[in-house]
Amino acid sequence: MLACRKPGLRPPLLLLLPLLGPLGPCSPGTPAAAAPADDAAELEFFTERPLHLVSPAFLSFTIDANLATDPRFFTFLGSSKLRTLARGLAPAYLRFGGNKGDFLIFDPKKEPAFEERSYWLSQSNQDICKSGSIPSDVEEKLRLEWPFQEQVLLREQYQKKFTNSTYSRSSVDMLYTFASCSGLNLIFGVNALLRTTDMHWDSSNAQLLLDYCSSKNYNISWELGNEPNSFQRKAGIFINGRQLGEDFIEFRKLLGKSAFKNAKLYGPDIGQPRRNTVKMLKSFLKAGGEVIDSVTWHHYYVNGRIATKEDFLNPDILDTFISSVQKTLRIVEKIRPLKKVWLGETSSAFGGGAPFLSNTFAAGFMWLDKLGLSARMGIEVVMRQVLFGAGNYHLVDGNFEPLPDYWLSLLFKKLVGNKVLMASVKGPDRSKFRVYLHCTNTKHPRYKEGDLTLYALNLHNVTKHLELPHHLFNKQVDKYLIKPSGTDGLLSKSVQLNGQILKMVDEQTLPALTEKPLHPGSSLGMPPFSYGFFVIRNAKVAACI
């Protein structure tokens, strides 16, 4: 039974679908009173013990490797504002990877771009993590040129016609310094398409990169390749799962002979679990699964070119994620049952995101629901594509302004702990009124062990109210309700928290995320098409202590 499982173990796969529904006999405590009106929904909590323990870096994010196509734009990573925003989401992994990663070649003799050189010169004789930002004239020039470079990158992505590019020691330094100064753990994706004549992986360029990073005493984790299931389409090269597994074994041997002998290795960063991809994942895990530390796969809900606002609000589309997770977990549990599973790259829509959707308030429904389902089903880490970069699914735009999903991510980081519990809504509203429950993040100064964090999405076009279970009904609750700001409604690129617009105080200061205390016994009101967090204080839940 679910109630008898140890923390951190995945429940049997047959139980995963019912997790969205009523809990049945496992639910402890006295049921709450009957809902007083049609707009009220009664909650059931399962808090006897955690379903799972996710990583403290559960919510992580990426920088797409295509940023290195023109290394001048790596200089953006010197922005103090961008670093402040990244630091707000620590602890987290920063994955550097993507399709372009398999077309990048490290050239240790390559000179840094003028913009990179200008940045490093401006940082000399200073603490690089505390010093000033990019020289203003350099930053202004790059910002003006970025929209044109963005179109180049998106065109390459849409057409799946990639060309090789080289990157320098300076680019590696810029990436590592950004991660280190932001409190992030860097995961670097190495080119897997460099092949010998007999189609084995050519590790010579990876060796050059390892040698350089070793000389700098960098602490880096590694990946090899991105979505190898699509190598044929991207590069005209077919590699089967067995060969890929052998390539990972070779990479692990390479790491073992270097300063990175204890480094983590993740993979295979495979696409969604469809027919040929499933076949590849199975054979990879059999051949090389032993040498990886976690199994990584990718997920997107919809095609960014044709996605609609209705797609972003459709509970049936949100639910498609469940079967993808189940398929992946089933494969891993059968072949490599002790391996953790990570969502190594994910967002709302593939192809760079959906224009005027993936960077708006509406995208938050997909993002928050994916976080909730991932934690509930046993995914240890979720890496959001991207923090900053080309397309529409970024957390931070081209002017380093945080977008709605950034603020949602920041609230998640501050309020949600790594012990995953269970909540459900009674009645027929489950698919459009989606709820998730964790122990509260006790690093938040206002909260303590035993507190609960409920997060919820209201996909109804009317206000709904949540009623806490009877034994928690009179507890103090802090509300963090997120709504769009301005006249664009669901398509707004700014948000308000409890009625206050969220924006940075200055380039190095994030705003306070101020709660709204509710009167004990109050229902938890949620306006139409909104999402938010509710911290139940002094809940004294034993599983959270």
From Swiss-Prot:
- Which superkingdom? Eukaryota
Propeptide residues per the UniProt entry: 112-159
Give the residues annotated as coiled coil.
none
Q: What is its EC number?
A: 3.2.1.166
Task: Give the membrane topology.
Answer: Peripheral membrane protein
Modification after translation = Proteolytically processed. The cleavage of the 65 kDa form leads to the generation of a linker peptide, and the 8 kDa and the 50 kDa products. The active form, the 8/50 kDa heterodimer, is resistant to degradation. Complete removal of the linker peptide appears to be a prerequisite to the complete activation of the enzyme. N-glycosylated. Glycosylation of the 50 kDa subunit appears to be essential for its solubility.
Active site, UniProt feature: E227, E345
Gene Ontology BP terms: angiogenesis involved in wound healing; cell-matrix adhesion; heparan sulfate proteoglycan catabolic process
Q: Which stretch is the leader sequence?
A: 1-37
Identify the stretch(es) annotated as Required for heterodimerization with the heparanase 8 kDa subunit. 290-419
Region of interest (Required for transferring proheparanase to the Golgi apparatus, secretion and subsequent enzyme activity and for enhancement of PKB/AKT1 phosphorylation), residue spans:
529-545
Family the UniProt entry places it in: Belongs to the glycosyl hydrolase 79 family.
Briefly state the protein's biological role: Endoglycosidase that cleaves heparan sulfate proteoglycans (HSPGs) into heparan sulfate side chains and core proteoglycans. Participates in extracellular matrix (ECM) degradation and remodeling. Selectively cleaves the linkage between a glucuronic acid unit and an N-sulfo glucosamine unit carrying either a 3-O-sulfo or a 6-O-sulfo group. Can also cleave the linkage between a glucuronic acid unit and an N-sulfo glucosamine unit carrying a 2-O-sulfo group, but not linkages between a glucuronic acid unit and a 2-O-sulfated iduronic acid moiety.
Which protein, by its recorded name, is this?
Heparanase
